[in-house]
């Protein structure tokens, strides 16, 4: 009976024409990047990133493992592992100013997401979300969150989720976050105060707003964006921004 009631409730949410969940978190110029980091992006090749990478205030020395080729104009680099461009604060104008704005917007987005009030759910399942089926809303966790089995997020294309996580976030090896009902990765925001680990062969979905380090391990994927206030580490990983890069 519990499953039947849940199924009816979820169906009602998905079929509703009214957007459910909190007001969207605005990324500003940070939305131009698949990966944006303040202290560097390191990579064990080959990884694949289908949009731009940016690092600031650290310079180009903070981008490793991509075999960068500088543009003749000096404002960006390219890599065979990156479909877009790689920008660093030490490159030529207008890159430094553009990155400063993007980082400012990233920090504001994190602050906005973490400071939302009146959560719909607090410490759901004590942070153990493996196997759960969730509905749109604001989720607050005063400790860490672990996902050890597939997680299902339901909703339509205008519905939203915000996860406020005071500790770490970990996705176990081989585990998937599945979005159903037309829910978009761009509308799922994970604001994490501690480190994020996406284990080998797992599949993560959503916008990662990390206060500290984000690690994406071997053959794992992130469909969304990684916006970190310290370092991003890729190990033969894939980062996919759905749709048009920067949009």
UniProtKB/Swiss-Prot annotation:
What is this protein's name? Ice-binding protein
Q: Where this protein primarily resides, as one coarse class? A: secreted
Q: Where is the signal peptide?
A: 1-19
Instruction: List, alphabetically, the InterPro entries matched.
Output: Ice-bd_prot (IPR021884)
Similarity field: Belongs to the ice-binding protein family.
Q: Where, per UniProt, does this protein localize?
A: Secreted
Keywords of the record, alphabetical order, are:
Glycoprotein, Secreted, Signal
């Amino acid at each position: 009976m519990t499953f039947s009631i849940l199924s009816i409730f979820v169906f009602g949410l998905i079929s509703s024409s009214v957007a459910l969940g909190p007001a969207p978190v605005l990324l500003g110029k940070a939305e131009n990047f698949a990966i944006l980091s303040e202290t560097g992006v390191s990579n064990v090749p080959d990884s694949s990133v289908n949009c731009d990478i940016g690092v600031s205030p650290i310079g180009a020395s903070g981008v490793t493992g991509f075999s960068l080729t500088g543009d003749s104009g000096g404002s960006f680099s390219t890599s065979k592992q990156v479909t877009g461009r790689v920008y660093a604060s030490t490159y030529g104008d207008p890159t430094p100013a553009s990155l400063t704005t993007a980082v400012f917007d990233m920090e504001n987005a994190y602050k906005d997401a973490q400071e939302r009030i009146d959560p719909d759910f607090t410490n759901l399942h004590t942070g153990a979300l493996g196997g759960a089926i969730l509905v749109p809303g604001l989720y607050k966790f005063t400790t860490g969150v672990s996902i050890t089995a597939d997680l299902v997020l339901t909703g339509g294309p205008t519905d939203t989720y915000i996860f406020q996580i005071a500790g770490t976030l970990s996705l176990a090896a081989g585990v998937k976050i599945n979005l159903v009902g037309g829910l978009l990765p761009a509308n799922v925001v994970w604001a994490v105060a501690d480190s994020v680990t996406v284990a080998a062969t797992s599949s993560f979905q959503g916008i990662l707003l990390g206060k500290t380090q984000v690690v994406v391990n071997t053959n794992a994927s992130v469909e969304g964006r990684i916006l970190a206030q310290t370092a991003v580490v890729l190990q033969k990983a894939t980062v996919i921004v759905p749709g048009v890069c920067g949009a």
